[in-house]
Amino acid sequence: MQLLTIGINHHTAPVALRERVAFPLEQIKPALVTFKNVFLGPQAPNTPEAAILSTCNRTELYCATHDRAARDGAIRWLSEYHRIPVDELAPHVYALPQSEAVRHAFRVASGLDSMVLGETQILGQMKDAVRTATEAGALGTYLNQLFQRTFAVAKEVRGTTEIGTQSVSMAAAAVRLAQRIFEKVADQRVLFIGAGEMIELCATHFAAQGPRELVVANRTAERGQRLAERFGGRAMPLSDLPTRMHEFDIIVSCTASTLPIIGLGAVERAVKARRHRPIFMVDLAVPRDIEPEVGKLKDVFLYTVDDLGAIVREGNASRQAAVAQAEAIIETRVQNFMQWLDTRSVVPVIRHMHTQADALRRAEVEKAQKLLARGDDPAAVLEALSQALTNKLIHGPTSALNRVSGADRDSLIDLMRGFYQHAPRSNDQSGH
């Protein structure tokens, strides 16, 4: 079985491409079914395995398959599914086989491949991806083992290194950028669009600055209300956004919408109503919530996840010692996993050997039972049974020795000696 990871992330592709390759949660299960059946092949009983990890910074396909051409098929499927020409997508895609795929999974879960070094959100997202793949019936022995080892490695890395300490989060970076635009965040009105984990983190950081007003707009009014109350703010219907956008100096958006929810026209009207006082906007969603053309407006300061990445990276350099520790742990665990994978490769052969030997045994026992039933001498029947089993069990190795010659034969002879050197002796004449 071959392990393979195909993907794009914030290292290889801009947000404009990442948002086109992202999978909304409700699409992942049906996508897994087509990915397995159409491009990896129905190789029963060795059914291919697959999982999809899709976040704002990455879209990755984890596969286990016997098809050595799965790499090209996976890239082609990703292209066709999202209707992106292969020539446009392929230069941004990485394909990681075997140990590289294992190492990548360990690094991703440990926060080493994140824009925010050591961040923990990705681990939860990976667990969600595994849960979804399990519900879709897409996981099997190999990916199950890979992900269980992945979660164990992430726990070890976070528990024995300082990889996650003093990290500059995306939420903290958003506050830092706002402080570059406004002298005091405390004097500003802040609007959060969405009520997920990222918005909750941003609200925590902005609330610490004591803004003049804090408002949450969300499709689900009850959830938005609960989040607003936590930070002493208030909620408003998302439908009020076009008519009330001008009230806010800072707007942070992160929803699961597949289409922009803030268009150029709405922002132009808001800027005009504000008499060209600046608006600071942060779009943390992928796909983006705010049309990119908004960033061209003179009085709008629009930042995406990629823009915030530059600030985040400033805080990453100081933790390189922890990175080295984490990489060493991961390398050891990769080797351990590959050893397990190697042992799995012989399981089908061993199973086949057992099946063949058992078939021979049953056939000879059946013959012996018939001979005993007709009254043949039991001792003679047992002798014939043992002789027949011996001859048939060594027929394969004997034939193999007779078929080869030269160096191949010498190697096979050494191998056979190793097989039989510990054979028990029923009549030891050594005198010991």
From Swiss-Prot:
Would you say which domain of life the source belongs to? Bacteria
Listed under GO biological process in this entry are: protoporphyrinogen IX biosynthetic process from glutamate
The answer on whether this UniProt entry bears the keyword Thylakoid reads no
Q: In which pathway does it act?
A: Porphyrin-containing compound metabolism; protoporphyrin-IX biosynthesis; 5-aminolevulinate from L-glutamyl-tRNA(Glu): step 1/2
Sites annotated Important for activity: H104
Q: Which positions bind NADP(+)?
A: G194, A195, G196, E197, M198, I199
Q: Give the UniProt family note.
A: Belongs to the glutamyl-tRNA reductase family.
Record's miscellaneous remark: During catalysis, the active site Cys acts as a nucleophile attacking the alpha-carbonyl group of tRNA-bound glutamate with the formation of a thioester intermediate between enzyme and glutamate, and the concomitant release of tRNA(Glu). The thioester intermediate is finally reduced by direct hydride transfer from NADPH, to form the product GSA.
| Record function comment | Catalyzes the NADPH-dependent reduction of glutamyl-tRNA(Glu) to glutamate 1-semialdehyde (GSA).
List the protein's name.
Answer: Glutamyl-tRNA reductase
Gene behind this protein: hemA
